[in-house]
Amino acid sequence: VLVEEYLTSVISSEMSATSSLALLKAHAIISRSWLLNKLYNKKLSLQQSEFRTFTEDGTEKFTRWQDHLDHIDFDVCADDHCQRYQGITKVSSPAVAEAIKETYGKVLFFDGKICDARFYKACGGVTEYFENCWEEVHHPYLVPVKDNLDDQAIPNLTDEKECEKWLLSAPKSFCNTTDKAVLSEVLNNYD
């Protein structure tokens, strides 16, 4: 499947194909960046033989992150582990086709490299460092940020009491909405 055809399905599978054009275009660029970063890093890691065994106290074990190395016979999977892909026959929309066309070839770069543009569908009001969720690699562009525009500082979520207070609250955030119009614009009817 060609990259742009793949992205048409990904965007229509991960979010509503009737979302605003601006949102669809942003999703196209993010998803294309993630995909091309994965393909490049998979090729690089296979060339560098990253399949290693490690010995710890005389016990042999195989250590790796669940990532692009999980897929030997194909590039990416069709579920949320990679990007939700429901096939090229997935119902799309003219707006998705327009978003793909208008962003053709556009990707996110940082320091001369295509960004690992992973994102999440669930939100607790603040993001986390990449290395705390995925693999022990620091990306300066994937650090904690609040999911709102107020001026309050991010609480120290490494402090148990602060974290408990945060988790038991309903933090003000863009994703903490019950507005049915907003939800229907961004979510498919099965999310």
Regions found by a protein language model. Give the residues of each.
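Conserved, single-site charged/polar hotspot
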Residues: V1-D191
